[in-house]
């Protein structure tokens, strides 16, 4: 059977014992779990001895996590069982070690896919890896500041009007996307300010391509226009974001946690909470700042 192995890590500025005990306590997981944050209505229950928790929801479906063994304060070994959409198991571990004045938390998983899903191995490895990275970032912020720094709201479907825009189309690795976006934002802002361009709202980004396996994306950062422009400098693009029915997901928090909103949307589309358009690219709107 095709094997799937994932390992991601992060360094947290907190005492080793505090980090270990926090992670070991399943009742703390809803605050930093990369899956539970996407499904606020998910039902979670805990074993009396603290060694297991179970969940069931419309988005994250159903499963359970049990502690198999632990070596305090350096390692916790779990068994992860998915009950739906089909039953499967995975071995999971959390390892804790001193590193550079902080604590390195390494989150790993080893599992096997059914043979008929062998072609999904690269995709599953990439997606689970990104999930682990999202969770570790929230865990770090939670332990260092007291808040995970990410909140999701689901206001329901709404009509989005068509919008003219001026923008920059770019390609970047997901790891370098923050820097690329910051560069594009400054370039657009400086040009708009220098030319006294009339804007009609806050910036947004349209995602034309997103490749989890290669960890790359192609996007257009756009500034909404009050009226179309007659001419543009080299490298700039103009277009119209088409009118559509949208399923908005509101994220409040740092840009580094925005993947929580995207994961929530992808999972809802997969579970038929809404029907995703095949012709209109998904987009994100920055209501205040993209920082």
How would you describe each model-predicted region?
Residues 1-46, 158-161, 180-187:
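Hydrophobic ligand-binding cavity/cleft-lining segments
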Residues 60, 79-81, 86-291:
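A solvent-exposed interaction/effector surface
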Residues 13, 24-32, 38-86, 99, ...:
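Glycine-rich portal/gate segments that line the openings of hydrophobic small-molecule binding cavities
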Residues 9, 64-66, 93-95:
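Short, surface-exposed charged micro-motifs
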């Amino acid at each position: 059977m095709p094997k799937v192995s994932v390992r991601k890590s992060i360094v947290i500025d907190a005492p080793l014992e505090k980090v270990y005990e926090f992670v070991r306590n399943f009742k703390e997981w809803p605050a930093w779990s990369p899956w539970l944050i996407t499904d606020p209505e998910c039902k979670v229950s805990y074993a009396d001895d603290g060694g297991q928790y179970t969940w069931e929801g419309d988005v994250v479906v159903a499963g359970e996590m049990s502690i198999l063994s632990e070596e305090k304060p350096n390692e916790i070994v779990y068994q992860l069982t998915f009950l739906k959409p089909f039953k499967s198991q995975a071995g999971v571990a959390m390892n804790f070690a001193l590193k550079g004045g902080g604590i390195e938390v390494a989150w790993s998983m080893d599992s096997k896919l059914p043979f008929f899903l062998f072609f999904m191995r690269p995709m599953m490895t990439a997606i689970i890896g990104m999930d682990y990275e999202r969770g570790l970032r929230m865990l770090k912020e939670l332990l260092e500041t007291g808040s995970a720094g990410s909140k999701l709201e689901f206001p329901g479907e709404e009509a989005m009007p068509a919008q003219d825009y001026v923008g920059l189309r770019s390609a970047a690795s997901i790891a370098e996307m923050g820097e690329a976006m910051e560069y594009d934002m400054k370039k657009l802002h400086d040009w708009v300010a220098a030319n006294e361009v009339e804007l009609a709202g806050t910036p947004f980004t349209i995602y034309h391509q997103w490749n989890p396996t290669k960890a790359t994306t192609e996007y257009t950062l756009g500034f909404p226009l009050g009226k179309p422009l007659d001419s543009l400098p080299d490298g700039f693009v103009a277009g119209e974001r088409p009118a559509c029915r949208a399923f908005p997901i509101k994220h409040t928090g740092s840009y580094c946690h925005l993947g929580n909103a995207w994961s929530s949307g992808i999972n809802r589309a997969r579970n038929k909470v809404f029907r995703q358009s095949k012709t209109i690219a998904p987009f994100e709107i920055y209501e205040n700042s993209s920082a």
